[in-house]
Swiss-Prot record:
Record GO cellular component, one term: cell outer membrane
GO biological process: monoatomic ion transport
Motif annotated as TonB C-terminal box, chain positions: 597-614
Organism of derivation: Escherichia coli
A molecular function GO annotation: porin activity
Binding residue positions for Ca(2+) 2: 213, 215, 249-250, 261
Protein name as annotated: Vitamin B12 transporter BtuB
Residues annotated for cyanocob(III)alamin binding in this entry: 83, 85, 92, 110-111, 251, 517, 551
Protein's cellular compartments: Cell outer membrane
The gene coding this protein: btuB
Stretches assigned to the TBDR plug domain: 38-152
């Protein structure tokens, strides 16, 4: 279950909370400021999801995890594996930075937005999710927030799991994490997931050529990691993973031409690192390489036919991060270097291009009596748009024991991607999108109820848009986002209740029209309890109405999609100390709804699974 953390403030006995899984008091978070710190010292709103949460919810995709979290809205073109977009606090899908073990996810293609429908949930051991601007720490993209997917495992042992469900869903997984001697650990994982799917296009709503078919998804994953303690303070690791996905989807069709309706994605990532953990100094050096090849093609002609489209991206990263204990807090500093390379013919890029970025950052955290102060500044030197500086600051005031007020301000930016710069409609003179965000929050513990409420405003300028008349991208867009976010957690006997409320008003500042696919109102509720060894969970989500475009006519029309209430029920039972049987019904009342106009979501689905550990 998701449950509020109750942690001791550093150098204080007062506990503050965030929305997260129940865990020991000394749990640390690394994503907020790129160094380990008690979760309660972080002034930004933080959510942590553990592997236990993922198993309890019985989710089959990363998107199914994220949709349950505060501030997140997801739009998807059909079922599992179909194109999806993530909106955090009303910002664009490419305004959320996605990290894998602290390293930027290599984005297949040149869209600049992470499509997590393709990332295997089997690799996820933990998610740290930070809301608000974080460009002063991570650089480009971190306007709405940061999602850090962590793959490292802690508990030794071997697990075999299997699951079957609606739409011919099958899932098989085997993983092991073993101690080799006193100082060496090895992790291996293999995963196979398949679903026949359902027809992604909603009948009669898009004007598309009828394609009465099933749009299925197949994924094969492998993961390996080797860790070794060189001494009491020095350690190193090497890690590699890859996945091979195939997705069928519905696409526009012109008689006599190939029907491009199949996607084949190959992705591999390798990284190695060296860590030092002293009493006052922590330091880490990590290098990584990733390569993604994303084919879209007509299966009758094959992915090497001239009609096929290939997005081929290589990414190189080098990170050096440091943190020093100073006074009642710490100071952090580091350097990030990244190079992205495309091959000729990638997407709509006629040539191969490189883009390099070097970022230098400085962070600080101090506890001064009843006040906690946090700040960061970063300068990025990019091969395309040269230098860009961002900064942020936050202050927390414990005005009454157990109650705190937090105020923060931060700037952020989004660099133009390679497609916008050099593609068929590219403009090499594009400038980065810029953001200024304010937030104020109260949090506390009242009568056993752990709560937090915040209000925020985000002004984004220099938005990159496409001009259909000049056939070029350009900077002129402005967006204003205003929102209220509230989270509450409390227990009533054996029941644990977790509630979040999001009001998000995201509008085009020039036309005052709401931004597409973002619901203005969301309410999420998680109820967990255990009775007679049965572990029950009920998930409720209300998504308010949202707007989208109808592309079946010209000029395009704006359409309003109604709101929907969704219920999931999950139960698990330990047959033996090693064998657990699980069952789940998703979309219990079989609601018919869309999160992207013209693309239907899954109806009622059943999943039966089991796992054996030894």
């Amino acid at each position: 279950m998701i449950k509020k953390y109750w942690f001791l403030m550093v150098y204080s006995v007062t506990a503050f909370s965030v929305w997260a899984q129940d865990t020991p008091l000394d749990t640390l978070v690394v994503t907020a400021n790129r160094f380990q710190e008690p979760l309660s010292t972080v002034l930004a709103p933080v959510t942590i999801v553990t592997r236990e949460d993922i198993d309890r919810w019985q989710v089959s995709s990363v998107n199914d995890v994220l949709r349950r979290l505060p501030g997140v809205a997801i739009s998807q073109h059909g079922g599992e594996g179909q194109l999806s977009t993530i909106f955090v606090r009303g910002t664009n899908s490419n305004h959320t930075l996605v990290l894998i073990d602290g390293v930027r996810l290599n984005l297949a293609g040149v869209s600049g937005a992470a499509d997590l429908s393709q990332f295997p949930v089997a690799l996820v051991q933990r998610i740290e999710y930070i809301r608000g601007p974080r460009s002063a720490i991570y650089g480009s993209d971190a306007i709405g927030g940061v999602i850090n997917i962590i793959t490292s495992r802690e508990n030794t042992g071997t697990e075999i799991s299997a699951g079957w469900g609606s739409n011919s869903y099958q899932h098989y997984d085997i993983s092991t994490h073993q101690q080799l001697g006193e100082n060496t650990r090895v992790t291996l994982l293999g995963d196979y997931t398949y679903t026949r799917g359902f027809d992604a296009v909603a009948y009669g709503s898009t004007g598309m050529q009828p394609q009465s078919d099933r749009d299925g998804f197949l994924s094969k994953t492998f993961y390996g990691k080797l860790e070794h303690n060189l001494s009491d303070t020095w350690s190193g690791f090497v890690r590699g993973y890859g996945y091979n996905n195939r997705t069928k989807y519905d696409a526009w069709y012109s008689p006599g031409s190939p029907l491009i309706d199949t996607r084949k994605l190959y992705s591999q990532s390798w990284d190695a690192g060296l860590r030092y953990a002293g009493e006052t100094l922590q330091s880490q050096l990590v290098s990584s390489y990733s390569h993604s090849k994303d084919y879209n093609y007509d299966p009758h002609y094959g992915r090497y036919d001239t009609s096929a489209n290939l997005d081929d991206m290589k990414q190189y990263n080098l990170q050096w991060t440091n943190s020093v204990t100073v006074g009642h807090g710490n100071v952090g500093a580091g350097i990030d270097w990244q190079k992205q390379s495309t091959t000729p013919g990638t997407g709509y890029l006629p040539k191969g291009y490189d883009q390099r970025n070097t970022g230098i950052y400085l962070t600080g955290l101090q506890k001064l009596g009843d006040f906690t102060l946090e700040g960061a500044v970063r300068n990025d030197d990019n091969s395309q748009f040269e230098r860009h500086t961002t900064w942020q600051s936050s202050a927390g005031w414990e005005f009454i024991e157990g109650y705190r007020f937090i105020a923060s301000y931060g700037t952020a930016f989004k660099a133009p991607n390679l497609g916008q710069l050099y593609g068929m409609y590219g403009n090499p003179n594009l400038a980065p999108e810029k953001s200024k965000q304010w937030e104020g929050a109260f949090e506390g513990l009242t009568g056993g109820v752990n709560w937090r409420i915040s209000g925020y405003r985000n002004d984004i300028s220099e938005m990159i848009n496409y001009n259909p008349h000049t056939l070029r991208y350009y900077n002129d867009g402005k967006v204003h986002v205003k929102g209220i976010e509230a989270t509450v957690n409390f227990d009533t006997g054996a029941l644990t209740h977790t509630v979040s409320y999001d009001y998000t008003d995201a509008r085009n500042a020039l036309t005052d029209k709401p931004l597409e696919r973002r619901p203005k109102l969301q309410v999420k509720y998680q109820l967990d309890w255990q009775v007679f060894d049965f572990d029950w969970g009920i998930t409720y989500q209300y998504m308010g109405s949202r707007y989208d475009s109808d592309y079946s006519s010209w000029p395009y029309k704006s359409v309003k999609m109604g709101g929907v209430s969704l219920w999931d029920v999950a139960v698990a039972y330990p047959v033996t100390p090693h064998l657990i049987v699980r069952g789940k019904i998703a979309n219990l009342f079989n609601k018919d709804y869309e999160t992207g106009y013209g693309y239907q979501a899954a109806g009622r689905e059943y999943i039966l699974s089991g796992s054996y550990t030894f």
